[in-house]
Amino acid sequence: MKEKEMLVMNENFNEEDSKIYSKSLMFIKGIAIDANLQQTLIALAVARRMHEGQHRKDGTPYFLHPLKVCSTLISYGIRDDIILAASLLHDVLEDCQNKLPLGGKELLTEYGINHEVYEIIQLMTKESGLNDYELSVYFNNIKKNPKALLVKLSDRLHNSQTLYTFSHNKLKKYIRETELFIITIAQYGKSYYPQYTNALSILKNNIHSLNNSMKIITEIYDKQVEDLTNTIKKKETRISELEKENLTLKNSKKDCE
């Protein structure tokens, strides 16, 4: 496994992208080496390889996202090898299918990711366009696994910090989803997983604060759009009235002639 790990880590990666995420990468690697977190070390290498060449809507290399998700968990006191490894790989099944022709089984058979990490990655993987019932099933499955729950909340927190890249409609859906499901499962975790109370509390509070801020902004925007729309409609109505008045005057003038 060490040979495979080194093979992945020594690949040629985009130099400019590497400069952007190198500090986060080395921070996590240092923590993992000091604590002998073998799954995390493997996950670092695999996630870097899988996300190479991918970028988020804000232009940053995609690999920076799982690094931030993992770093956040570390900063909140999490040192569990399974949790940190899963946080680094949480998007690979969803976003790296072209590099996983066997549907992700390669993570187990080729790279040495263990079954517990793989199970969390599967729980995190979500199809697009789910309705409320399907979303409730998805989030309920996550909340039953405390380690998956931590990864999901850290993922949501980082995504909530880059909502400015979302379209207005997508942003409103995201805010609603956070209110209906994310805050609920975070509260569930605080009640049922006392070993992670501190991390869950911080994650929940930060997500809630960001979500409320974005909700206020969208409500202000919607109100401004509504006011502008009403103003335009009033002006259009007035223009129509003036045109009718003008036509009436013209007709009256013709009659007089």
What is the predicted function of each stretch?
Residues 2-255:
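Active-site helical microenvironments for divalent-metal-assisted chemistry
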